[in-house]
C-alpha cells in the first residue's frame, strides 16, 4: 500500500502545482458541496419521483445513493482506515474543512458514479448531464487534497457495480412506469 500511496501523492502534487487557481478553487469547492452525502443525487431522485414517468428511476436513485452513504461511511471506510492525503502530507493548505472519517473509498465518488450509472441506464440522455457532473465531483476530491486517485478509482468501479445492480433490481422488482396523460 505504501507504493500506491507514494504514487497517489505524486499525482496529487502535480494537480496542486499545475491546476490550482483561485477561480478553479471556487468551482471545485462548489462541486464538492454538491456531492456531500449524495445530496444533489438524492434531490434529483426526489424531483424525479414527482413524475409518474420517472418515479421508478427516482426512487432507485434516491434509495441506492442513501444506501451508498450509509454502507460506505459505516462499513467500508472502517474496514480500511486509510489516512487522507491531507493527514499524510500537511504541507498542502486545505481549502475546505477536513472531512471526517477515512479516505478509502471516496464517498462523493461512490454516490456520484452510482447515480450517474442508474441515470444513464434508465435513459442515455440523462447520462449527458450526470456523467460530467459525477466526474467533476470526483475530481474535486483530489483537487481539494482530501482523496487519493486510488480512492477515486476504487469508488468509480464500486459505483458502476452498485449502480448497475440497483438498475437491475429496479427493472425486475418495481412496476414499469406509466405514461402521464
Question: PLM ranges: what are they?
Answer:
Residues 63-77, 128-141:
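Small-polar-interrupted transmembrane alpha-helices in polytopic inner-membrane proteins
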Residues 91-181:
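Membrane-embedded catalytic cores of phosphoryl/pyrophosphoryl-handling enzymes
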Residues 36, 51-52, 80-81, 145-148:
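Short helix-capping/hinge motifs at transmembrane helix termini and TM-loop junctions
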Residues 23-24, 53-57, 123-128:
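Membrane-helix interface segments
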Residues 30, 39-42, 125-132:
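Alpha-helical transmembrane segments of integral membrane proteins
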Residues 1-39, 73-101:
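N-terminal transmembrane-helix/juxtamembrane module of multi-pass inner/ER membrane proteins
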Residues 47, 67, 71, 75-76, ...:
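Alpha-helical membrane-inserting segments
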Residues 47-70:
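Interfacial segments of alpha-helical transmembrane regions
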Amino acid at each position: 500500500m505504501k507504493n500506491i500511496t507514494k504514487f497517489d501523492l505524486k499525482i496529487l502534487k502535480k494537480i496542486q502545482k499545475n491546476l490550482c487557481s483561485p477561480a478553479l478553487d471556487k468551482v471545485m469547492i462548489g462541486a464538492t458541496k454538491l456531492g456531500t452525502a449524495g445530496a444533489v443525487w438524492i434531490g434529483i431522485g426526489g424531483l424525479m419521483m414527482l413524475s409518474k414517468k420517472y418515479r421508478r428511476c427516482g426512487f432507485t436513485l434516491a434509495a441506492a445513493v442513501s444506501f451508498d452513504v450509509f454502507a460506505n461511511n459505516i462499513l467500508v471506510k472502517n474496514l480500511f482506515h486509510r489516512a487522507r492525503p491531507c493527514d499524510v502530507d500537511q504541507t498542502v493548505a486545505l481549502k475546505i474543512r477536513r472531512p471526517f472519517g477515512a479516505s478509502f473509498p471516496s464517498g462523493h465518488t461512490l454516490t456520484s458514479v452510482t447515480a450517474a450509472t442508474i441515470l444513464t441506464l434508465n435513459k442515455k440522455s440523462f447520462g449527458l448531464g450526470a456523467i460530467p457532473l459525477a466526474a467533476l465531483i470526483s475530481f474535486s476530491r483530489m483537487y481539494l487534497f482530501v482523496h487519493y486517485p486510488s480512492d477515486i478509482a476504487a469508488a468509480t468501479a464500486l459505483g458502476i457495480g452498485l449502480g448497475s445492480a440497483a438498475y437491475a433490481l429496479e427493472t425486475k422488482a418495481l412496476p414499469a412506469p406509466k405514461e402521464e396523460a
